[in-house]
Structure formats: structure tokens, C-alpha cells
């Protein structure tokens, strides 16, 4: 097979592919690993369940893009329906559909991983060149404020009125026109995602990418591994054939749900696999203004209030919360608002008058990925009382900010909705109980389910990513993180994957 991108939906799949390294997952971690290992002269095959979408294929249409770019059409959730679990299913992974934010791992997190989890190799000093390289790979920059949506400006206006510390966020845009549909992919290819950077560099170095390829099991032993794959149809929902990839090594980088799912289906790894899940939940908050805001025009997420982050937390490395401006398309926003019928129509009639934020709140390990009887993932999560309390505090501060910016009312879109019209209403937020299926809590930064540790007694993978108890199986994605990276995970994933891939390349060359 000579194609550098082989679409299994387009022709009869080959019975077998051969490689030195088979990588499962083409997102930030997988594409970066493919780039490094291919440039080291290794034969690399990368498996991706989704399709390849760039340029005009990214239609900006909610129903089409959610169907094709998101796992389970964006409907994946915890078992109790309390948290929506957003994950990419596309060549290039979640970096294709994120809000372009470039947020490195805070120094306090590296220190915490050293001190508490025994990962002495991951010092801030040792990881600094890899973090810097990640920023280069992403063309990290501060976008022109003329391209910001007004929602960002209103958040900053309110923060400054209250004397709160905030900052413009780094992004990975080049040639942005401010279309505002980042969460559905960029049809201008302005987002310098893994698809446009790492995948292309890996292809140039000889790596092959296989799309519409669902990895279902890892078999074999030692240096003779085999990944069993189902070929999918053009829409990615029906199997149309099977093949296998024969490889010396397998690197799993499929995300913190799919990686443990594949290990559990394969009977690989120790009892830590699937445990220690962190979802880093985010709570949306919406503000309504008398004047038009048109927050859907321009970059949706460019400013964050950082006043309430705490880098020196002894237990977690980074704690507190961030308040980050955001905006979605009508399809996205309508699913988050708590009304139905005529009330929903009235609310969406105010779409041009609203601004929104996400309250990003790092969590401690408190969830698990297990298998349903049919092999699909079962995601359970214990939403800790302490985390709920930080959500309430974050909502209180965000409401104060929007009121200071001139909002007529601020709403947490729970059922029933909690609406704040003045600071005298802030105590209403104490009623937020976050019961399952009552509040649209989101997770876009899943971590921790194949925890990296200094010994098998404390985790599932070694500091070099090698799965404890197995030869020839490695994990390079956010599943490894022993505690929350406390940031948007694209940049951490690129940083850590490059570090691990360079180590692996050196080992294989020796």
C-alpha cells in the first residue's frame, strides 16, 4: 500500500499492513509521535476511526459536522448523563474541533508530578524545550484583537471594572478571518491543528495514515504485536471489512476513553487501567445584554480571567478555576439552554444579545472507564462536593463580571435555570446541586485512565509510557497524566508525546 492516507471506506481493505510501530489515534499525541518516529527512520502506520476533513469539507453546518467530527455525534456522556464527554473522531483528533487555545502545562503541575507521583524525569527544566517546541509546532500567537468576538471584550471589560486579573489566550491560528465556527473545524485551514502540521510532517517522513479504521483489539506478544481493525463505511458507522496491522510496537494515543477501552478489550495492563479518570469539567454561563453583542462573529475564545487559579496547591499542583470566554453556533447554544418549545424559541431569539463563558475547573481523579457488555465504553464519574463548590464560586465571580460589563441578567443554564439580575441575587447560585441531567456540564479534557507512575503499584504505565507488565505496548496520550494538566490538553499532549517519542526512537535505534 503506497498511499500516505488510506481511506478504508473507499476501496477493499488490504488483509494486512506491516510496520515497525502502529499508532492508534491521530490527534495531538498520535500525530506528534508519528512525526518523530517516522523522521527517526521507522515504518509507522497510524490508525484513525474518523475521516479526513480539511478545507471545504468542513461545511460549518452543525448537524453534518457533529455527525462526522465528534465521537458519538457529540452525544457521548457519563453513564448518569451528568457530563457530556466531547472527543474528536477525525484525522488530526480534537485539535481539529477545539477553540484553538494553546495553554502549556503550568510549572506547578510538573513540580507536583515530581513530588507526589515520583516522576523525577518530568521536571519543568527537562520539559521546557519540549513545551517550547510545542508552541513552535502550533505557531502559537496572540490573535489580533480586531478578530476577537465581542464576547471576549465584554468579559475583559467586566474583569477590569472589578480589578480582576486576566489575559489574552495564545492560539494556533494563522490567516484567521474570524468566522467563529472553530468548534466545527476551520474551512479556511487557518487552525494549525495536528492535521495540518504533525500529520503532514509525518507523511513527508514516510508515515502512513489509515482512516475509517476502528482498532478493536491488540494481540500478540513482545516484538510481534498485531492490531485488529474493522474497516468502516464512508459515514463511519457500519463495518465493511477487517484487516490487521503487524508491528514490533504499538503506541496507543486514542484519548483517555478509547485507550483504556482498547486495553480492556485486549486484556492488557494491570488493575489501574481505566481508573483515575479526570474529566476537568466545564460549566457554561450565559449573559444577556440589551444591545446586540453578535458574539458569534469573530474568535470565540481569546480572553480568560486567571485571577482564581492557584499554582501552589500541595495536593493537586494547580487548582481553583478559570473563566474563559466562549461562543457556539446556534446548534451548539440551543442544546445548552434549559428551555424547550416556545420558551426555547424566545431564548434563541436573543442569540445576538448574549455572551458566554466556560468555567474551567480542574478536578482530582474521580472517575472510571469500564466496558459495557457490547465492548463500548462505560464512563462513570463521582462529581466531588469540593468541585461543585468551586463551580458555584466560579459562577458567582463570572456573574459579577458580566453584571459589571452591563448585562441585564446572567444565567446558569440548569434545570430550573438560575438567573442573576443583580449582586443581590448571587446567593441563588447556592441552590445549584448539579444533579445528573440537570446542568449542561462539558468535558473536553479527559485524562488519567492509564496513569503514569514510578512503579506498577501506583499506576498502569512507566515514566517512558510503556505499559506495565507488557512488552511492546506504549501509551502516549492524556491517559498517562497522574493528575490534571490543569489546562487545555492539546499543548500538553504534544509536549509529552514528543518527549516520549524521542525517548522511544533513541531506544529503538540502540
Where do the language-model regions lie?
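Rossmann-like flavin
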Residues: 91, 95-176, 359
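FAD cofactor-binding and catalytic pocket of flavoenzymes
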Residues: 98, 270-402, 435-437, 443-449, ...
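N-terminal FAD cofactor-binding segment of flavoenzymes
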Residues: 42, 49-99, 105-108, 152-158
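Helix-loop-beta segment of a Rossmann-like dinucleotide-binding subdomain
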Residues: 91, 95-97, 135-142, 166-205, ...
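N-terminal Rossmann-fold NAD(P) dinucleotide-binding loop
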Residues: 30-31
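Glycine-rich loop(s) and the adjacent beta-strand/alpha-helix scaffold that form part
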Residues: 36-39, 43-45, 50-55, 60, ...
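A glycine-rich dinucleotide-binding beta-alpha-beta segment and adjacent secondary-structure elements
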Residues: 18, 168-169, 178-182, 216-219, ...
